[in-house]
């Protein structure tokens, strides 16, 4: 696919449905981004990220958790974080009846896990999340054994594998050891 190829929401849904082994996103300029399936370790860490978040939120009833196949539409971009949280009350009442539509909002909290992706590309994606309304983002960098925390105020903090991250005021009370997703 040429790097200049732009797609509409309907085209992106159609392309995704015809290619279930691939994941697609759309950049803010409308260009299509194709991501191959992850390897075993990356898929495992994505599943763990969602499971840790879901397990904690199920007992606190603060909102909904979404996995890496969910498309979030913020401005013109459509992105699919490895795990995401949307606070209660922010989703449209009928959100769970709209299977063939992207969620038309930015999550409150996202988790991304670096696989073989260039770290600069993922860091730019994290900044884009924040620019589009995400309040807190965690980027786990397995290659360098660290994590980065992105906040709505634009600050970014780097943490070592030995640190424990917390959901701050976005997912209040949620904590996770960095090493658990490395």
Specify the residue positions occupied by each region the protein language model found:
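Gly/Pro/Ser/Thr-rich low-complexity, intrinsically disordered segments predominantly at protein N-termini
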Residues: 1-182
């Amino acid at each position: 696919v040429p790097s200049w190829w732009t797609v509409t929401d309907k085209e992106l849904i159609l392309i995704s449905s015809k290619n279930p082994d691939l994941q697609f996103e759309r950049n803010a300029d409308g260009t299509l981004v194709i991501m191959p399936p992850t390897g075993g370790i990356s898929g495992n860490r994505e599943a763990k990220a969602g499971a840790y978040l879901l397990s904690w939120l199920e007992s606190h009833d603060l909102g909904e958790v979404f996995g890496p196949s969910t498309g979030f539409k913020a401005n013109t971009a459509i992105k699919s974080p490895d795990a995401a949280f949307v606070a209660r009350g922010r989703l449209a009442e009928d959100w769970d009846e709209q299977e063939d539509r992207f969620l038309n909002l930015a999550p409150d909290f996202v988790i991304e896990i670096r696989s073989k992706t260039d770290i600069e590309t993922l860091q730019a994606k994290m900044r884009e999340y924040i620019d589009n309304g995400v309040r807190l983002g965690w980027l786990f960098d397995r290659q360098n054994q660290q994590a980065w925390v992105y906040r709505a105020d634009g600050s970014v903090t780097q943490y070592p594998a030995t640190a424990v991250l917390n959901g701050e005021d976005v997912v209040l009370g949620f904590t996770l050891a960095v090493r658990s997703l490395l």
